[in-house]
Design a protein with these regions (language model features):
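Active-site neighborhood of phospho(di)ester-bond hydrolases with catalytic His/Asp-centered motifs
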Residues: 22-28, 46-51, 72-75, 99-104, ...
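Residue-level detector of beta-strand structural context in well-folded domains
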Residues: 61-62, 108, 135
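Binuclear metal-dependent phosphoesterase catalytic core
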Residues: 5-12, 67, 93-96, 112, ...
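Conserved beta-strand segments of alpha/beta enzyme cores
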Residues: 44-46, 70, 117, 145-146
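Core catalytic region of metal-dependent phosphoesterases/phosphodiesterases
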Residues: 2-66
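Active-site environment of divalent metal-dependent phosphoester hydrolases
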Residues: 3-7, 30-34, 52-57, 79-84, ...
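Histidine-centered active-site/metal-ligand motif
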Residues: 1-3, 25, 75-77, 104-106, ...
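Active-site-proximal segments of metal-dependent phosphoesterases and phosphodiesterases across multiple
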Residues: 57-95, 125-128
Length: 155
């Protein structure tokens, strides 16, 4: 059974909830997400199912607008993100998105590809390349103006 977040995700929410306008959860741990969001009923949350969210009713990808920025978000396993990012980039561009958020690799990533900015926050509970991470993005007037990969707070 995949269970990635345990208390790491809850620690991130505790630290960041007052500073964020919305949360985008990129899959693998939907049961943990539901529990972690209970104390924050006003937080706008968007989520997709990952390859370890067996039986989930959430979609595999989504599209949302934040401050004039069209955001395509997905776990990424259906777009082959462990092998290359071309399919993901094309899928985001086809939907008119300026930003594509993805997970699945458990590796933090940020890159501009043509008109699409690609961002992977890493993993709150099982980052493969170092400390567990999450991501913060600032969007203004249809553009990513700042991004950051942050280490998940310790206990």
């Amino acid at each position: 059974m995949c269970r990635w977040f345990d208390s790491g995700f809850e620690r991130v929410l505790l630290k960041e909830n007052a500073n964020i306008d919305a949360l985008v959860f990129l899959g693998d741990g939907l049961r943990d997400l539901e529990q972690a969001l209970t104390p924050y009923p006003r937080l706008r949350a968007y989520s997709v199912a990952g390859n370890c969210d067996y039986g989930a009713l959430e979609p595999m990808d989504g599209l949302a607008a934040f401050d004039q920025t069209i955001v395509f978000y997905t776990h990424g396993h259906m777009y082959g993100v462990k092998y290359d990012l071309d399919t993901l980039t094309d899928a985001a561009a086809a939907r008119g998105a300026e930003l594509a958020l993805f997970g699945h690799t458990h590796v933090p990533h940020a890159e501009q590809r043509g008109k699409v900015f690609l961002f992977n926050p890493g993993s709150c509970g099982r980052c493969y390349t170092g400390p567990d991470t999450y991501g913060l993005l600032t969007l203004e007037n249809g553009k990513v103006t700042a991004y950051e990969h942050k280490e998940v707070p310790k206990q």
